[in-house]
Each structure stands twice: as C-alpha cells, then as structure tokens.
Amino acid sequence: MNPQAILARILEQHEIPYEEMIELMRAIMSGNVSPVMTAALVTGLRIKRESIGEISAAAQVMRELAVRIEVPDASHLVDTCGTGGDGCNTFNISTTSAFVAAAAGAQVAKHGGRSVSGKVGSADVLEAIGINLDQTPDQIARSITEVGIGFMFAPNFHHAMKHAAPVRRELGVRTVFNILGPLTNPAGASNQLLGVYHADLTGVLAQVLLRLGSRHAMIVHGSDGLDEITLSGPTKIAELNAGEVREYSVQPEDFGLERAALTSLQVNSTEDAQAMLLSVLDNHPGPARDIVLLNAGAAIYVAGKADSWARGVETARDMLASGAAKQKMQALVEFSNQVSA
C-alpha cells in the first residue's frame, strides 16, 4: 500500500477499491501515514467526492477500532447525530431531540463530541447542563438500559482518531472524518436519524448504511444547508428501511408546523445553546420547539416507537407537554454523576 500512489489516483478522479481503502484507513488510524499525507488524501477525496465504497471501507475500519458498548437488546436503539460542518450555528437540535425520543421509549445511544466547525457541540451543551462525560463503556451501557439514554463522548471511544484529529482540526474544512463520526456509533445503533451537510450525501450515506447493516435510518439535509430536518423550507430525505432506500422531501406544513427562519434557531455560545435546549424541554412554544418536534418525531419513528413519522411528531409533542422529556434529561444528569462518583 503506497499512499503517494493512492493520492495520485485520487487526483485523477479514480475511486479507491474497497480493500485498498481498508488498508489505507488502517494505516492512517495507526499513525503510519504522515499528517501531511493524511491531509492531502482526505482533501483529495473531498474534492473528488467520496464514493459509497470508500466511505463504507473507512467506516468499517473505524468501527473495528472503536471501543464497543454492549447493549443487551438493541432493537429500539437509535442515534441522533449529524455530520456537523453545516456552518449554520444552530442550537443542539439532535441532542435535544434525543431526550424526547428517550422519553417516548426509544433507547438512545447518543454519540458526539465537542464542536469542530460550529459554535457548540453536543458534548459542550451536555456538559453545561451537568452531564458527566467521563463514563466507562459499562456505565454507559447501564445508562442506556436503565435510563433509556446514554452519551458516548467520541474521543473516549475512537482512540485511533488521535492520529487524524490534529489534521482535521488544522484543516478546518469538511472531510471524510465529518462523515465517519455518525457512521461509527460504539453501541452499534442500527436505527439512526443522521443529518448531513450536503444534499448529495443523503442517498450516498443511505447506501453506506445499507452496506453496514443498518435497519431503519433517515439521512436528512435541509434546503437552507442545515444538517437537520429544517423549518425554513423543504428537507431532502433518504430513508433506509428493511433493506430498501426511498428518497423524498418534506416540508414543515406536512406536519402542521409553521415555517421559521434559521436565524431564530442560531446561538453564539454554549450558554445560549443551553438556554434554548432547556426552553424546549420546558415546552415553550416557538421555532425551537417545532424543529425538535420534527426531528424527535423522526427519531421516534426510526426507533420503532411510532408506526409513522407523523405519529412520532405527535408522540414528541406529548413527551414535551407532559414534562417526560425534561425528566429524562434530569435522570441522565443524575445517573451520569452517580456512576462517576
């Protein structure tokens, strides 16, 4: 395996064969490819546009090298995670939605880290509300089983990423590493709501997840660039369910919700993001609550806790109105600090 030769082929717009991509990723993740060459390779792949096979191979390697979390019954296990890198600087929509989905009976294996390209990452806001991020795999497995939700702080589970992390940080642009995070859930969640930073990635990642054995997933991209289901206009969806992929688009009006500008959801600090998350869990009406209804409804649906997305949205509404979603957040704060004491 010759990284220079692979780079030359990438620059000529050639796809890297699956087995060769596996070998290349193992070399990168073991520190056997220099930072300069790693940066050139991932930038070249980005310009060429990563193929289904290349992404699948890279994700397979990251999954192999990840610290695993074993959950006894994973049938309703779901992750709500985005690629980030959308530049929209919204509050943590998928993180807030995770509490709502957990309140509805989904088992949420939330996977995330600190912000790389946005204002506030999921780990930043969860830490701000009092959740202890430093938990062992066994403790997180218990959290998922007993509380219904657990948070996996990505750096604690993807130790091999330490070789690529400085490159990713210094480049400061979207690369295959943005795509890989949501594809490498340490608990192996086979149900997923996955937001992506580019519309072209919806169908691509649906095919990747199909190859990787996912059960029910929705890959979403808002027309405003948001890596979530958006309120400002249409959202492009690629839905993988029972081995088949269907592509379509939805609008807020399809669920009886009003459109709202992206600016109404943007934050400038962790404090702003925390305040908006808590406002939604307190069931305060407005665009923040509405966008969580849309996204949590989808998560509830893919987790198998509603037989349609529309019913998932109504269940999400009930979870916020009853206070069950806020109670789920409080339960996770309490559990994470008990087990870490």
From Swiss-Prot:
Pfam families: Glycos_trans_3N (PF02885), Glycos_transf_3 (PF00591). Pathway: Amino-acid biosynthesis; L-tryptophan biosynthesis; L-tryptophan from chorismate: step 2/5. InterPro entries: Anthranilate_Pribosyl_Tfrase, Glycosyl_Trfase_fam3, Glycosyl_Trfase_fam3_N_dom, Glycosyl_Trfase_fam3_N_dom_sf, Nuc_phospho_transferase. One of its GO terms (biological process) is L-tryptophan biosynthetic process. Binds 2 magnesium ions per monomer. It comes from the Bacteria. Mg(2+) 1 binds at residues 94, 228. Keywords: Amino-acid biosynthesis, Aromatic amino acid biosynthesis, Glycosyltransferase, Magnesium, Metal-binding, Transferase, Tryptophan biosynthesis. Anthranilate 1 binds at residue 82. Its EC number is 2.4.2.18. 5-phospho-alpha-D-ribose 1-diphosphate binds at residues 82, 85-86, 90, 92-95, 110-118, 122. It catalyses: N-(5-phospho-beta-D-ribosyl)anthranilate + diphosphate = 5-phospho-alpha-D-ribose 1-diphosphate + anthranilate. Anthranilate 2 binds at residue 168. It is an enzyme of class 2 (transferase). Its cofactor is Mg(2+). One of its GO terms (cellular component) is cytosol. HAMAP family: TrpD. NCBIfam families: trpD. PANTHER family: ANTHRANILATE PHOSPHORIBOSYLTRANSFERASE. Belongs to the anthranilate phosphoribosyltransferase family. Catalyzes the transfer of the phosphoribosyl group of 5-phosphorylribose-1-pyrophosphate (PRPP) to anthranilate to yield N-(5'-phosphoribosyl)-anthranilate (PRA). This is Anthranilate phosphoribosyltransferase. It comes from Nitrosomonas europaea (strain ATCC 19718 / CIP 103999 / KCTC 2705 / NBRC 14298). The gene is trpD.
